């Protein structure tokens, strides 16, 4: 796989996992997933894009420490800032759960990829 394809694939995995996080969160609160999925996901997706740009993640898209950790941190922090800016909830419990789940997802897949390669 070319480096451009690897980077695009890694970004796609990250984006799908962020949407999965948003969908499971809505399901866990017995909310309609399809109706509110975009409302829940967009702040984290926008923050994910920022994380990729800030860290230049395409240079080492599968790296756990160089890419995974900062992309995760920027996605969580940026997503929460954007949610707060538009009046969405940012309760401490939500911040903690989001940080843990997104860590497992965004850093976890990279760690698994490292283990199997």
Q: Each predicted region: which residue ranges?
A:
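Membrane-helix boundary elements
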Residues: 2-36
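Internal alpha-helical transmembrane segments of multi-pass membrane proteins
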Residues: 36-37, 55-74, 92-99
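Structural signature of hydrophobic alpha-helical transmembrane segments
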Residues: 35-46
């Amino acid at each position: 796989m070319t480096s451009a394809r690897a980077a695009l694939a890694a970004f796609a995995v990250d984006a799908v996992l962020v949407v999965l996080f948003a969908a499971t969160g809505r399901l866990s609160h017995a909310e309609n997933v399809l109706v509110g999925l975009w409302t829940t996901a967009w702040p984290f997706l926008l923050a994910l894009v920022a994380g990729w740009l800030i860290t230049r993640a395409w240079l080492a898209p599968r790296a756990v420490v160089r890419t995974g950790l900062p992309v995760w941190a920027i996605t969580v922090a940026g997503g929460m800032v954007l949610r707060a800016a538009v009046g969405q909830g940012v309760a401490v419990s939500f911040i903690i759960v989001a940080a843990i789940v997104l860590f497992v997802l965004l850093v976890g897949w990279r760690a698994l990829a490292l283990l199997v390669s």
